[in-house]
């Protein structure tokens, strides 16, 4: 810095006024940037912010279940692209596939003002694809408000759970006291020698007390399942058709609902070379991940976008296609696999989306990038789909006779449960589709 001061104070002799002006501007700018780069205070601040961000990333990733981490990576991967100044090869060599520029002073101030939970949520939103240019003081305050509301609801839920627990304990204690009182009354009556003829019998008193207990308990009535789209649906009232989306199901998707023998027979006679000549064992394995037509109940619902993310459009085989994916888990044969539910559609002549591809694809955290990469998806997609084949309206779909399954919709997930027709208490297979991460 002293050398720069000398060069500014002692410019070379023989310069014109214009040359001297440019010379001084250049070296003053160099001094300013030098002071910026060599500022110990600045680097200490950057080191502090890096430590905060790294700890937040660690807490986020270690605190998530595998399917939640898949959802985080998938959502962020859909929204992020390589920066213009990096080619894909250079970025891979640099191991710097994606980055965002965020104001370190703003992030540090947010951490000091609101604490670690808000900082963690800010980092989570960056991982979900939030651009650094969109992170300003107003956005930080909005995130802080969301975190506060989330904490308030959590506290209310905890308080409610404690009250319910205390209530259950009080009910149990009251029941125990009544039973003890009843036993004492019975002993007292047995000890009496003469009983009034008009006194109520012991059985009558017990009956009355029993009726009182039933009235106090209130007797909650369990909601019965209702038939929805060929499946037994639990977890809420039946909604009207208003707002539900229109879909048709292509024959190649419906084929997987049949028996393995029938599926093999039809594929062997069909035009798709990838399925011809497959063994019956292979068909049985593929049926497990392809026979998930119950997913359309979710896809047609008003809040389908809360579960499925748009994986892009492309043209192939003479038609424009769209791909959607959702994070899920498949439980079958005592095993649990995490992965994605893939849905491929094209539009028919009336503009109605036709589902020609439906599959659960087991996916590891390391391979999630390929699953959501439009180029990889397009390359692996079926070459040509016979768009003239007969399709079925999704709202009219019913599983073949003998198949028992039900759909269960909850706050953060949607489940399809296949059961043993002979013993419905036995679950043969379960597919869980998870809600997308919250983007602020």
UniProtKB/Swiss-Prot annotation:
**Matches recorded under InterPro entries:** DUF3654, UPF0329
Region Disordered, residue ranges: 150-244
Q: Where is the composition biased (Basic residues)?
A: 234-244
- List the Pfam families hit by this protein, alphabetically: DUF1609 (PF07753), DUF3654 (PF12376)
Q: Report the superkingdom from the record.
A: Eukaryota
Basic and acidic residues: bias regions:
150-186
Q: Into which family does the record put it?
A: Belongs to the UPF0329 family.
* Protein name, per record: UPF0329 protein ECU06_1680
State the organism named in the record: Encephalitozoon cuniculi (strain GB-M1)
